[in-house]
Amino acid sequence: MTNFLSSCIILLLLAQPAWGTPQHGLSLYGPQDLKYKPGQNYKYANPNAPKGGYLVLSDFGAFTKLNPASLKGVPAPDIGQLVFQTAMDSSMDDGEPFSQYGNLVEKVELAEDRLSMTYYLYKQARFSDGHPLTADDFIFSFNLIQDPEYHPFYKTYFKDIKSIEKIDAHTVRYHFAHYNQE
């Protein structure tokens, strides 16, 4: 959830010469500088990697909650990175430090006036229980962190997001409070 919303802010900060056109990713230097084409795997990822098995991790200390955003309790170490998937993510390739590619989103569109950004979700995106990911889930997550029971960091961090709008079941638009030149 936190990573998803972080992606929203990061994308706001990226300059995009092809504003108003849905793209599979965003780059500080424009879509022509994206290394990967739509549907292409990262060079360091194996699409045929074996699936299944166990992951066992250890850490010092104890935890009392699995929700890293709530105020009460101690979260499990790195739970946010292990459980939540971001809407977009960065390539780990050298020479591509400011590029974001769709992870849960097939396309992203930054408005020409940079006051809104639209995510076109992958229709195949699912939760671990098999339920489809929808625009309602993005809205729920955004509204959830506005709750006073959640850490005030999130409300402050995402204060530039004025509102979020459901366009259809698989499209969501973020409206920003003001133009941000960065």
How would you describe each model-predicted region?
Residues 63-66, 126-127, 180-182:
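Primarily extracytoplasmic ectodomains and periplasmic/lumenal surface modules that are beta-strand-rich
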Residues 156-182:
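Surface-exposed binding/hinge segments that line
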Residues 35, 45-50, 70-78, 107-151, ...:
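Aromatic- and charge-enriched surface segment that lines or borders ligand/interaction sites
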